[in-house]
Regions:
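Amphipathic, charged alpha-helical segments and their helix-to-coil junctions
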Residues: 1-172
Length: 172
């Protein structure tokens, strides 16, 4: 029986920490901000018309009241439709921007695996058990090849993202 060598890697860590992912996150944040501003303006329009409706409905004829109610319902429907469309567009943009980053990580792992004669590489976080003596952990080597700073971790990234979110919240 042929002895197959295997490797394992923390793919999630590599994808999240690779420097190119920072650019992806920035582009997505900018798009999200623009989207929320657009939706906010639409919601404000709805709120204004709803308040006007509440204040003036008693003075309107039934025909005008029905017309204004229909207009409100159309604005609400347009808002909900745009909300769904924007969400889909953001997801598509995320997939499009992340694809080359994920491909780069996969190619890097594949090159490292081939160089070490590994038959296959597992995603470390998806395995119930890995005996380190039996396999090769490629995460550290891949981090170096992908120019991920040694001190950058998922925890430090999470803290960085939370700090950014809090700073953005404070500006609102």
């Amino acid at each position: 029986a042929q002895n197959l060598k295997f490797g394992y890697v923390n793919y999630t860590e590599l994808v999240q920490l690779v420097p190119e992912m920072d650019t992806v996150r920035e582009q997505l944040e900018a798009q999200e901000k623009e989207t929320y501003e657009t939706l906010g303006a639409m919601y404000q329009e709805y709120q204004t018309k709803a308040e006007q409706f509440q204040q003036k409905q008693s003075t309107w004829t039934p025909a005008i009241r029905d017309s204004k109610m229909k207009e409100l319902q159309e604005i609400e429907a347009r808002f909900q439709e745009n909300q769904q469309i924007f969400q889909q567009e953001l997801q598509q943009m995320q997939q499009m921007l992340q694809a080359p980053v994920m491909e780069k990580v996969q190619n890097t792992v594949a090159e490292l695996a081939k160089a070490q004669g590994l038959a296959f590489v597992f995603e470390e976080t998806q395995m119930l058990y890995i005996d380190p003596a039996q396999g090769v952990n490629l995460t550290t080597e891949a981090r170096k090849a992908l120019n991920i700073p040694e001190d950058r971790t998922l925890e430090s990234l999470q803290a960085e993202l939370q700090a950014k979110a809090q700073a953005a919240q404070a500006q609102m």
